[in-house]
C-alpha cells in the first residue's frame, strides 16, 4: 500500500495500520516524509523526530523519495493525470497540487526547515504544460502551484502560461522582496490583461525591519509595501501570514508595525492568517525557544513556543493593532480562536 502523507497525523495513521496489519507492506512518502539526507535503510526526517524508544514496524517504510524516484523513472516524465472519485459531486470545489519544485530557494527563515531538503531528491518541472486544465470535473478547480517559495524564473515562465478560465483558481506562495516583485510585474505585464484568478500567499510575519531581519526574511517593510501596491494594481488576492509568539519584541517593533499598517494600501490584503510560532525540530528557533512538546504517537513535531508575561503583553498589543487595521484596510483576520490560548 502506497500512501502520500501531507501531515503528521497521516503518517501516524499509516503507522497504526502497519501495526494492525503486519502482513501488508506500507510505503509512505509525501511532504511530511521529506528527508535531510538519503541513507539506504534509514529514514532521516526533516519535520519530525521519532521517539528513540520506539521501533517502527518492519512493514512500514517511510521515504523522502518522489513516486518517480521510488520506481526509478525520471521525475515529471509521465503524463500528469488526476482521477476524481465518483462520490464527489460534479459541481463541488476540488483542491489539488501541481508541483513546480520541492524546495525553497531562499532557505534563510529561522523558523523553517525546508532548506534542509536532501539535494539528492530535488526535482524541478522543466515544462509547464498545465495538464490540470483537462481534469474531468465540472466544478471549481483550485490548483496549488506547489513550491517551497516560487522562484523568479517560475514567476516569469509559469504565470503567463496558466489557462484563464472561470473554473480555475490558482494558489502559490511568494516572497515579497524586490527581485520577486519585479519578476511578478514582468509576468503580469506579459499577460496583457489576461490574468487568471490568482491568490498569492506570502510571509509578512512581523513587519518591523528589526523583526524581519531577525527572522531572516531578507526584505524590508518598504519592499513589502511595493509588493502590495503592485498586487492591488493588478487585482490579485493576497493571503498574508502574520506570526506571533516572538520572545524578543520591543516597543519600537509595535510602533513600526502600526506605521506599516497605516501605510498599507486599502483592499490590498484579502485575508491575514494569524499563527503562533511553532518550533519544528531542526529549525533554528527550536534551540532558542521553549515550549511543551507536541507528540502524535511516536512522532515529535516540535512545540508551540512559550513566552513570558511581558512578551505576551507585547504580542497581544501587536494582535490588537492588526485587528484594528483589518477594519480600516478591509481584510479578514483568521486564526483568532486558536491563537488566543497562547496569550493567556
Which ranges hold each PLM region?
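Conserved SAM/AdoMet-binding glycine-rich loop
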Residues: 2, 23-27, 125, 129-239, ...
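Acidic, low-complexity intrinsically disordered segments
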Residues: 2-129
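Charged helix-capping and loop-helix junction motifs
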Residues: 16, 217-223, 255-257
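Short beta-alpha junction loops
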Residues: 30-36, 244-247, 278
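Short aromatic-enriched loop/helix-cap "lid" or pocket-rim segments at secondary-structure transitions
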Residues: 39-41, 109-110, 158, 184, ...
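Structural recognition of alpha->loop->beta junctions
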Residues: 39-59, 190-202, 256-279
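Active-site glycine- and acidic-residue-rich loops that bind
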Residues: 179-180, 247-257
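C-terminal accessory regions of radical SAM enzymes
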Residues: 252-344
Amino acid at each position: 500500500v502506497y500512501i502520500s502523507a501531507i501531515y503528521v497525523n497521516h503518517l501516524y495513521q499509516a503507522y497504526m495500520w502497519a501495526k494492525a496489519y503486519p502482513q501488508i507492506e506500507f510505503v509512505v512518502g509525501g511532504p511530511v516524509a521529506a528527508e535531510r539526507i538519503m541513507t539506504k535503510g534509514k529514514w532521516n526526517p526533516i519535520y519530525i523526530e521519532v521517539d528513540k524508544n520506539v521501533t517502527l514496524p518492519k512493514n512500514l517504510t517511510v521515504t523522502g523519495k518522489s513516486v518517480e524516484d521510488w520506481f526509478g523513472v525520471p521525475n515529471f516524465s509521465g503524463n500528469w493525470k488526476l482521477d476524481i472519485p465518483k462520490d464527489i459531486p460534479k459541481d463541488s470545489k476540488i483542491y489539488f497540487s501541481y508541483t513546480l519544485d520541492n524546495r525553497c530557494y531562499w532557505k534563510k527563515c529561522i523558523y523553517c526547515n525546508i532548506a534542509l531538503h536532501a539535494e539528492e531528491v530535488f526535482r524541478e518541472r522543466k515544462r509547464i504544460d498545465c495538464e490540470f486544465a483537462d481534469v474531468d470535473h465540472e466544478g471549481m478547480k483550485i490548483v496549488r502551484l506547489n513550491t517551497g517559495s516560487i522562484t523568479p524564473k517560475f514567476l516569469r515562465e509559469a504565470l503567463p502560461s496558466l489557462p484563464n478560465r472561470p473554473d480555475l483558481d490558482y494558489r502559490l506562495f511568494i516572497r515579497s522582496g524586490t527581485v520577486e516583485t519585479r519578476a511578478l510585474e514582468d509576468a503580469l505585464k506579459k499577460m496583457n490583461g489576461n490574468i487568471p484568478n490568482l491568490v498569492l500567499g506570502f510571509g509578512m510575519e512581523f513587519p518591523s525591519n528589526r523583526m524581519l531581519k531577525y527572522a531572516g526574511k531578507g526584505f524590508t517593510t518598504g519592499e513589502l509595501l511595493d509588493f502590495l501596491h503592485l498586487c492591488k494594481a493588478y487585482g490579485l488576492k493576497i493571503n498574508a501570514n502574520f506570526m506571533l509568539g516572538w520572545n524578543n519584541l520591543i516597543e519600537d517593533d509595535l510602533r513600526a508595525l502600526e506605521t506599516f499598517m497605516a501605510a498599507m494600501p486599502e483592499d490590498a490584503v484579502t485575508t491575514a492568517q494569524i499563527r503562533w510560532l511553532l518550533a519544528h525540530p531542526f529549525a533554528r528557533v527550536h534551540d532558542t525557544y521553549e515550549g511543551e512538546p507536541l507528540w502524535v504517537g511516536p512522532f515529535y513535531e516540535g512545540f508551540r513556543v512559550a513566552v513570558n508575561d511581558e512578551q505576551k503583553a507585547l504580542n497581544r498589543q501587536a494582535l490588537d493593532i492588526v485587528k484594528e487595521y483589518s477594519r480600516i484596510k478591509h481584510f479578514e483576520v483568521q486564526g483568532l480562536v486558536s491563537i488566543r490560548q497562547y496569550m493567556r
